[in-house]
Amino acid sequence: MENSLWKQCLRRLEQEIPDQQLNTWIRPLQAQEEEDRLRLLAPNRFVLDWVKAHFADRITELLSAQRPDRPPRLELQIGSSAVVAPPRRRQVSVTTPSPSAAADQTPATRSAASNLNSNFTFDTFVEGKSNQLARAASMQVVENPGTAYNPLFLYGGVGLGKTHLMHAVGNAMLRRRPEARVLYLHSERFVADMVKALQHNAINEFKRHYRMVDALLIDDIQFFARKERSQEEFFHTFNALLEGEQQVIMTCDRYPKEVNGLEERLKSRFGWGLTVAIEPPELETRVAILMSKALQEGVDLPHEVAFFIAKRIRSNIRELEGALRRVVANAQFTGQEITVEFTKEALRDLLALQDKLVTIDNIQKTVAEYYKIRVADLLSKRRSRSITRPRQMAMALAKELTSHSLPEIGDAFGGRDHTTVLHACRKVESLCAEDSRIEEDYSNLLRTLST
């Protein structure tokens, strides 16, 4: 039976929801259509709960718009349908690849002239709230190089996708104009090339090399700190490129003005274009990243496993993908199915280390310092808003970042009942949805505790 209702809904949702969210939550749903209802079957409890919480209302609206006289009833269940089975992905092979075969697959395909990694594209970049602006700005640079945002400055912690985005811009530029001169390099390479040019009395050739490009993509500019001659040369190169409307993209591990040992004139010029932060990915994006990576590798990763890994690994994408590689490798070597229990065992030492690093005591100290109150205030019976709100934040963070039960968390906060902790978690969730300042506070605390 053709699911015309669901197909129409899906077409609308495809216009409204980013691809990674569609692939993670919507496309796994299987539809069963009857006269007065549309039943959507989710592959597991995680997908079911997420769809109910985030998409059910919108799907109901779309159904009502299609049949305003007799709106079909939406039903969400766990199950599967042989009629609308999703395409299967390859299962994890239990055969250990030979070292030579593995070596052939490991190096990324690169362009010798540009140093670009052709695997880093916009298609393989998973978009989320944490990197949405950075991706949009990068796309604009591709559309209008040298004029839209010049320079484009991306900053954020290690392993958050800054380099991926920079390569994606370069690759997209070359697809549009294969003759374009796009050069990617690490700032350390710029310094090394300059030193070599000085040693061989070839500084003019060095200048021509870096100033005759259409786009210069330079990674980790914090490496220039306290290197006065390198900063001097880059300053003039930077000016020459901007005067010629040649695109400059830079990355850094922190906001440019926070880089000690970097000349003020450079910091000032870096702010001429657009400066964008990339934050650690939120839970939904982390799940999408894992599912996307598994799909690229041809691995059938259950949603509940992706959800488990994403809940426990929060710091950056590099560690997230590293955890996935470890789980997949263990499955290959042992021939076992990837389940949540198998994943817990495969990541046992990693999770144990994380549990040691993030404790309720650490959370209480961090929250107290953030709100400029005492830890004793968090544990007290005081109920003023200046104390209650930080206490609720700390309880919610303890629930998210540790494996302690609600009663254990309540006990650590002055012997409170588990229902108090549950209320605090729900309160923080609703406040974050309503107040962007509280959401920012929570994100800041989460980032501090996770890195």
From Swiss-Prot:
This is Chromosomal replication initiator protein DnaA. Residues 115-331 are annotated as: Domain III, AAA+ region. One of its GO terms (biological process) is DNA replication initiation. Pfam families: Bac_DnaA, Bac_DnaA_C, DnaA_N. Residues 85-112 are annotated as: Disordered. Residues 1-82 are annotated as: Domain I, interacts with DnaA modulators. It is found in: Cytoplasm. Belongs to the DnaA family. Keywords: ATP-binding, Cytoplasm, DNA replication, DNA-binding, Lipid-binding, Nucleotide-binding.
